[in-house]
A protein has these predicted regions:
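Active-site C-terminal subdomain of aminotransferase-like
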Residues: 110-234, 238-243
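Short acidic, glycine/serine/threonine-rich loops at helix termini
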Residues: 1-4, 30-36, 79-82, 107-114, ...
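Active-site phosphate-binding strand-loop segment of PLP-dependent enzymes
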Residues: 52-101
């Protein structure tokens, strides 16, 4: 919704082709928003710490720039972008700055009270930050379907509204894309917030960050793998200079761990939640990681198999249109109503003779 709001503001300011300037690591939802709202997204490279390169972001700004984006943290590596530095660009060039805190929003606000103050501010205390998003269904522990967008000034919020005054059915006004919204989700979200309360969120944050810091310090000492950047919250991304990291995914998956496979560069990440703060869970995770890495390092150049190989192949495919087409075919299959009958293929068509 922030993208829609800033597009309308850009139109008002005479920009005909609004652009979103975002880090390479910013969520794909910004690509989705650009596609939906007829905007162009400019992706900015990262530095060695997996933070957005501020100089590169400065060079990416043009007269068509409608908004800047930072993440707190970004999804792939759990790293927070240098928001105060980017905010200076926002102020200098009078461009709105959106902070995507969808993943960590309900952690970062409680970090200081939990005894883990952040290295830099991220919110409206930073001059230039005009909006922040935070998903209540993640570390807010509310049901899926609820999220929050905050604006530094209500003048920005008005741009996300849609109003049709001449419809025969009457005046139609909607604050979001969804025309009708279920009250049950909002009520369940409110109930979750009331159940945990500030003290509950502070305690949850304390346990999660404590566990994450412990895991990070231990993982950094395992030969054969490394941690990307300086993750301050709950996501740790791993890479390797010695072997195909997707082999580690295969072995950990076989041990019951659900890690996310990442690309460009090849990596894995692990998102720590309250479940992982339970007794001996972190210890078991480290034990399994060490055993898996030791096994791989006996033959580091061995070929990757299974799902790891498939993901690696998808990343290496030069024709990204082919990858997109295969993804669309998969999504299409989820909505298929075709049934398999004798003598037919999966899509219902006759088998060739």
């Amino acid at each position: 919704m922030a993208c829609k709001a800033y597009r309308e503001l850009a139109f008002e300011n005479g920009i005909k082709t609004p652009e979103i300037v975002a880090p390479q690591s910013a969520h794909a939802a910004f690509d989705k928003a650009a596609s939906y709202f007829g905007m162009k997204i400019i992706r900015v490279p990262l530095n060695k710490m997996m933070e957005v390169d501020v100089r590169a972001m400065r060079r990416a700004i043009s007269r068509n720039t409608a908004m800047l984006v930072c993440s707190a943290p970004q999804f792939p590596h759990g790293v927070i972008d240098p928001i105060p530095e980017v905010a200076k660009l926002a102020v200098k060039y009078k461009i709105p700055l959106h902070v995507d805190a969808c993943l960590g929003g309900f952690l970062i606000v409680f970090m200081e009270k939990a005894g883990y103050p952040l290295e830099q501010p991220f919110d409206f205390r930073v001059k230039g930050v005009t909006s922040i998003s935070a998903d209540t269904h993640k570390y807010g522990y509310a049901p899926k379907g609820s999220s929050v967008v905050l604006y530094s000034d209500k003048k920005y919020r008005r741009y996300q509204f849609f109003v049709a005054t001449d419809w025969q059915g009457g005046i139609y006004a909607s604050p979001t894309i969804a025309g009708s919204r279920p009250g049950g989700i909002s009520a369940a979200c409110w109930a979750s917030l009331m159940y945990f309360g500030e003290n509950g969120y502070v305690e949850a944050t304390k346990q999660i960050i404590k566990t994450t810091r412990f895991l990070k310090s231990e993982l950094e000492n395992i030969k054969g793998i490394f941690v990307f950047g300086n993750p301050q919250l709950s996501v740790i991304a791993l890479g390797s200079r010695d072997f195909d990291i997707y082999r580690l995914f295969n072995l950990m998956n076989a041990k019951g761990w659900n890690l996310n496979q990442l690309q460009f560069p090849p990596s894995l990440h692990f998102c720590i939640t309250l479940v992982h703060t339970r007794k001996r869970v972190a210890i078991q995770f480290l034990k399994d990681i060490r055993e898996s890495v030791t096994q791989i390092m006996k033959n580091p150049r061995a070929k990757t198999t299974g799902m790891g190989a498939i993901y690696g192949m998808a990343q290496a495919t030069v024709d990204r249109n082919l990858v997109a087409e295969l993804s669309s075919v998969f999504l299409d299959s989820l909505f298929s109503t075709d049934t398999v009958t004798q003598g037919s293929q999966m899509n219902g068509s006759p088998k060739p003779r």
